[in-house]
A protein has these predicted regions:
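Bacterial N-terminal signal peptides that target proteins for export
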Residues: 2-16
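Surface-exposed, proline-anchored Ser/Thr-rich loop/turn motifs
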Residues: 322-346, 358-363, 390, 407-411
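Active-site metal-binding motif and surrounding structural segment of the metallo-beta-lactamase
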Residues: 51-56, 63-116, 212-228, 243-247
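C-terminal regulatory/interaction regions
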Residues: 259-320
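Core dinuclear metal-dependent hydrolase active-site scaffold
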Residues: 29-80, 139-222, 292-318
Length: 411
């Protein structure tokens, strides 16, 4: 991965101009993916716009931020309705503005679904949210994939503690942060993970859910930092598994929580993840050359092979044949594929593995049991040996206690 920001080496102006032209040509020939981390202060809000124009709004900050920040931005972009909303969990700094946005847009402001973790919660913000979304409310499930079009998908990696805590999950039985929806946004070689306020340490209120889901996420380009940079999230096991090239911290200046903490910032720096922060916050300081405070929105534009963040250029993922090192990895090549796809993987446990292929609806397409070694080639057929149609598929490789997942695109 190359970054004009992360390595401390900035491209000469001439090369940057040439790159801008190339990116412009790519955008003109194929619309890309756009992700905007809106600055809603000490809250969360992420807008995803697929290459086909499908929109997904993940959280909308505190009450007041919906009409004060999110709605004006949507209107400035000519967005009169949303296809999807996602509530990562029911804390007011995440859902407080969702009802405001939905109520203020057009009559059919929500086209498809309002996705959340289900169950119930007893706060005014929750009641206002559920009233606004009405019959469009749907409970998201683990493994569910939302096809946003143009090759962009969002997969639910975890919800309601990833099975760690026992149901029921309502009325404040557990701290909401333990129950967060974790999403993996995928577009070609680009991957970004968003997990609300998911905790990574065991305390009197929190449970380490991060370590349970890390392998299912795998290496990503961008990590939306959990819990505004609290030291109770982003543990070292999680970070060393997802290895984010870039980390985004959504935080408010002068917050009373001391976010982001210096401990959290140091963890991100230790895995060489360049930091973009919406506001100054009230805690730790990003070391020189390791990140920047944007004081505004964080805008990510993704085209095949690369992405930019507020003008800084990065390469997406790892192309071609994957490396063979590392305790946990899964890569597929070629990807997209037209005939066969070879999966190269390593799970740090002995014994046979099972490989399962799913379609975007979560239906089992094929399964291969008692696979040994670290390479397997799928010929693109289903259980009944028929060739599967072109589209997006997911592979899951499972051992007795570990599993890895990745996306395949068949042409």
């Amino acid at each position: 991965m190359f970054s004009t920001a992360n390595t401390g080496r900035r491209w000469p102006a001439f090369l940057m101009a040439c790159l801008a032209l190339l990116v412009g040509f790519a955008s003109a020939s194929q619309a890309g993916l756009e992700v905007v981390g809106l600055d809603v202060g000490q809250g969360d809000c992420t807008l995803i716009i697929s290459p086909t124009g499908t929109t997904m709004l993940v959280d909308a900050g505190y009450t007041g931020e919906g009409v004060g920040t999110v709605l004006p931005y949507l209107q400035s972009r000519g967005i009169k309705a949303l296809d999807y909303t996602v509530a990562s969990h029911y804390h007011v700094d995440h859902i407080g503005g969702l009802d405001e946005v939905i109520n203020a847009l057009t009559r059919d402001s929500l086209k498809v679904a309002a996705l959340d973790r289900g169950w119930s919660y007893t706060t005014q913000a929750y009641t206002q949210y559920t009233t606004a979304v009405g019959t469009k409310r749907q409970t998201i499930t683990e493994g569910q994939v939302v096809d946003l079009g143009g090759g962009a998908t969002v997969r639910c990696v975890a919800v309601n503690s990833h099975g760690h805590l026992a149901a029921p999950y309502d009325n404040g039985r557990y701290d909401e942060n333990n129950l967060c929806v974790v999403l993996l946004l995928d577009y070609g070689d680009f991957e970004m993970v968003l997990g609300g306020d998911l905790p990574g340490y065991n305390t009197s209120s929190y449970h380490d859910i991060e370590s349970l889901v890390a392998a299912d996420i795998g290496d990503v380009d961008i990590y939306k930092v959990h819990h505004h940079g609290s030291s109770n999230g982003s543990n070292t096991t999680f970070l060393n598994t997802i290895l984010p090239e870039v980390s985004l911290i959504y935080v408010g200046t002068g917050n009373s929580y001391g976010h982001p903490t210096q401990t959290l910032i140091n963890r991100l720096v230790a895995v060489n993840s360049y930091i973009y922060q919406t506001e100054l916050g009230a805690g730790g300081t990003i070391p020189s050359g390791k990140g920047e405070v944007v004081n505004g929105n964080i805008v990510i534009d993704v085209v095949p092979g690369s992405y930019t963040i507020n003008g800084d250029v990065y390469d997406c993922g790892t192309a071609g044949v994957p490396p063979t090192g590392g305790p946990l990895f899964l890569s597929v090549y070629p990807n997209p594929f037209s005939g066969e796809a070879t999966m190269r993987f390593n799970i740090a446990e002995s014994g046979p593995l099972a490989i399962r292929i799913f379609d975007v609806e979560g239906r089992l397409v094929n399964v291969f049991q008692t696979v040994r070694g670290n390479t397997y080639t799928w010929d693109g057929t289903s259980l009944d040996r028929r060739e599967v149609p072109a589209g997006v598929y997911f592979v899951r490789i499972s051992g007795p206690s570990q599993s890895l997942s990745d996306k395949l695109v068949k042409r």
